[in-house]
Amino acid sequence: MNLHRKTLVLLHGHGIDDTIWDSLDAAINDTHTVVRPNISLFTSCQTVEEYADELHRFLTNANIQKCTLIGHSMGGYISLAFAEKYMDMLEGFGLFHSTAYADDDAKKHQRGQMIELLRTYGTESFVKSTAANLFGDRYKELYPERIKEHIAHFGKLPAEALIAGITAMRNRPDRTAVLASLPFPVLFIIGMQDKLIPFESVIELAEFPKKSYPLIFAEAGHMGMVERPDATARMINWYMSKI
């Protein structure tokens, strides 16, 4: 590993795997050492804290002592749990279509329904039912074939791993205090058409850290790395230059 290059860890969200970052590779790999853990197959973790411990083991085994950690959606929940326990390993932090708030009762109920859907019908039906809410309207209109490819690719993930992830998300605590305690600027990537993480709630979170850098996509949903890869890569590169 080149010691002069900063290490950037990109942690994917639920219902996808690390290939979701593929469209960013060319734009960020030349500048940083990019690490993309794949947590999509984990079945033994039942809490975000357990996922964070697995991430710590992975990074330690890779001899990574310092890194910038950017988590997408569920990856953000895990990243906050990681920051709470392993702050000394971090030199930068980002929430990518994610939040530090806990689930409210309605969201917890919805997650219970998702678990039942997975148990009854399996992964492909689950991915089909959730894919429409992942992307902004413009992307869905312009690229319907890519939505089909998304379903075909991620519809093969093991249902047991998806259920474990949903259980962990449902039971996670509020970590706004962790967000406020971060000693470095925090990157927020936000989609105004995000149906899963509402814009209004995330923009409020930007007030918690001592310094925040929000990137707002007017026409993106929950998948900015796919919907707006060039702008995402530019913002990540810019953020990495500031820490």
Question: PLM ranges: what are they?
Answer:
Residues 102-109, 121-181:
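Conserved alpha/beta-hydrolase catalytic His-Asp/Glu region
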Residues 182, 188-190, 194:
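Short beta-strand/loop motif that positions the catalytic acidic residue
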Residues 220-233:
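Catalytic histidine-centered segment of alpha/beta-hydrolase-like enzymes
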Residues 2-48, 58:
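Conserved HGGG/HGGXW glycine-rich cap/lid loop of the alpha/beta-hydrolase fold
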Residues 66-104:
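Conserved hydrolase catalytic core segment
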Residues 50-67:
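Conserved acidic catalytic loop of the alpha/beta-hydrolase fold
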Residues 199, 203-222:
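Catalytic histidine neighborhood in serine/cysteine hydrolases
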Residues 12-14, 67, 71-73, 191:
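Conserved alpha/beta-hydrolase "nucleophile elbow" surrounding the catalytic nucleophile
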